[in-house]
Amino acid sequence: MSNTTIGKFITFEGNEGSGKTTQSKLLYEKLLDNGIKAVWTREIGGTDIAELIRDIVLFKDMSITTELLLIMAARYEHIEKFIRPNLNEGKWVICDRFIDSTLCYQSENSEEQQLILELHRKLLDNFFPDLTLIINVSPSIAMQRIKIREIHKNTNQLNKFDSRNQQFHQKITDAFIQVSKLFPERIVQINGEPMIEDVSSEVINIINNKMKVNLLR
């Protein structure tokens, strides 16, 4: 089920280097510009405890099951301490990654995806976004953007997902396409390869249509 609070919960998903973080922040800023109360957050993270878990998951080697359980713990903390309270205050919560990333990164097949969804139902009260935007780019473009991003950061410290090969990024891209078919009423796919401004305009169009608002550009 979607959240039943008075605010709106919008998530952005996609491969590393897809531009989802940029687009999520642009939407957050656009909401504020239009007088809509909003907050921006991310997963793994969003609270002090969840951010500590983020560093462990992104930079330490572990089994996929350990990753999953740590992420679920971080998500529970995030929902209870940040997401739900802000939604209950009537704010829009814009989140960079949520359950769909877990379905893509922490599973190898449909059976494992069903296990994740069962955990989500039991542990997190089946809490889903009102709308999810998946930003799609080809794996080759994703890897180019990752390299450019790290140069601009002036650091060689890639997290373990950033540093994977093109085959891995293709697998994640394919997984997001498959997940979008599981939740067609909630998920909209967007081509993230055009200019940032063009992708942002498409995001605004989708938000206006799906959320019944009239955000000015």
From Swiss-Prot:
GO MF, any single term:
ATP binding
Gene Ontology terms describing biological process: dTDP biosynthetic process; dTTP biosynthetic process; dUDP biosynthetic process
Q: Give the binding site residues for ATP.
A: G14, N15, E16, G17, S18, G19, K20, T21
Gene Ontology CC terms, in alphabetical order: cytosol
> Under which name does UniProt file this protein?
Thymidylate kinase
PANTHER family linked to this entry: THYMIDYLATE KINASE, UMP-CMP KINASE 2, MITOCHONDRIAL
Reactions mediated catalytically: dTMP + ATP = dTDP + ADP
For this chain, the family text in UniProt reads:
Belongs to the thymidylate kinase family.
Task: Specify the domain of life of the species encoding this protein.
Answer: Bacteria
The EC number(s) this enzyme carries: 2.7.4.9
